[in-house]
Regions:
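Acyl-donor-binding surface of acyltransferase catalytic domains
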Residues: 60-137, 239, 263-265
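Conserved active-site tyrosine of GNAT-family acetyltransferases
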Residues: 96, 249, 254
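Conserved acetyl-CoA-binding loop-helix of GNAT-fold acetyltransferases
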Residues: 63-70, 205-210, 214-227, 231, ...
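Conserved beta-hairpin
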Residues: 32-35, 94-103, 175-190
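A conserved beta-turn-beta hairpin within the catalytic core of GNAT-like acetyltransferases
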Residues: 44-51, 104, 196-203, 213
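A conserved beta-strand-loop-helix scaffold within acyl/acetyltransferase catalytic domains
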Residues: 153-209
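N-terminal charged segments
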Residues: 1-76, 88, 93, 155
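A short, well-structured alpha-helix characteristic of acyl/acetyltransferase catalytic modules
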Residues: 135-148
Length: 270
């Protein structure tokens, strides 16, 4: 990997680590462990959306780092997701396999500088995006995300996570912004979020309810968030793209720079 690509990959990882640890660092019943080799986030509930391990560097100690993270959640009987930036070496892969984790998704890490972006102004008729300003809207955000998991235990705990967040003041902090897309009748159908870190702003959680997909709502959410960011930020913007969303981000000016593999242990999953 080229030096420039390595640097951008590190920025993407750092912003992600800030995002997934932001609530846990200041919430009762949650915890964050950080070493030079990994970061572990325990949300205090059996939900792999928020119980996260990040392998920070694939080096001589990566095998032990993977083992420490997977053993921790196994002892708690909690599901977890393990996020690994490529290149991922053979020893880490072997330990991941030995721990019983399976590959759940592969995302593309992408970046762009504000000066290179020109968001589209298009907004579908009968649809609007707004930044969340009330505890009730935080709960709506969680309700949309939880619907992506059907009737599973994961869905219940995702909803509970945002109910607890709504009771705190963390969602009002400037580091994090939550957005919700609603229809004219007030029905929430799409969500998105941002996270500010030392070197970048990250875009996350772009998701639309199944029955409202293919109508441009997710794309409109992304471009609205991007427009908001550009009103106050003139530097680096990062995100992670699934295969389905990569095209929208590339057309907007984002460049792929790294692959991120997400593994899950499946403990507690219905």
């Amino acid at each position: 990997m080229k030096e420039m690509d390595q640097r951008m990959s590190a920025y993407i990882q750092h912003n992600f680590m800030e995002k997934v640890s932001f609530v846990a660092r200041e919430s009762e019943g949650m915890s964050v462990q950080t070493t030079e080799q990994y970061m572990l986030v325990d949300c205090g509930m059996p939900a792999d959306t928020f119980n996260i391990g990040v392998l920070r560097a694939d080096d001589a100690g990566s095998e032990g780092a993977v083992r420490q993270m997977t053993d921790y959640f196994a002892a708690r009987s909690f599901p977890m997701s393990l996020w690994c930036w490529e290149p991922l070496g053979a020893s880490a892969r072997q330990e991941i396999e030995h721990a019983g984790l399976s590959l759940a998704e592969v995302n593309e890490g992408m970046y762009a500088y504000a000066e290179d972006l020109s968001p589209e102004a298009y907004m579908p008729e009968g649809f609007a995006v707004k930044q969340i300003r009330t505890p009730g809207e935080v709960e709506q955000f969680g309700a949309v995300l939880s619907c992506l998991f059907g009737e599973s235990s994961e869905a219940k705990h995702v909803s509970l996570y945002y109910e607890r967040l709504a009771e705190s003041q963390l969602w009002t902090r400037p580091e994090m912004a939550l957005y919700i897309g609603v229809l004219n009748d007030g029905t929430p159908v799409t969500v998105g979020s941002t996270m500010r870190s030392r070197d970048s702003v990250g875009i996350y959680d772009i998701a639309t309810l199944d029955e409202y997909r293919k109508r441009g709502f997710g794309s409109a959410m992304f471009h609205h968030i991007l427009s908001d960011i550009l009103t106050w930020h003139d530097g680096l913007i990062v995100l992670q793209a699934s295969e389905a969303g990569a095209g929208v981000y590339k057309r907007a000016g984002f460049r792929p720079v790294c692959a991120i593999r997400v593994f899950e242990n499946g403990h507690g999953i219905e």
